[in-house]
Swiss-Prot record:
The keyword Endoplasmic reticulum does not apply. This is Sulfakinin-1. It is found in: Secreted. One of its GO terms (cellular component) is extracellular region. InterPro entries: Gastrin/cholecystokinin_CS (IPR013152), Sulfakinin (IPR013259).
Amino acid sequence: EQFEDYGHMRF
């Protein structure tokens, strides 16, 4: 998935 919340950054 592209819109996953990676700690603090969103891709």
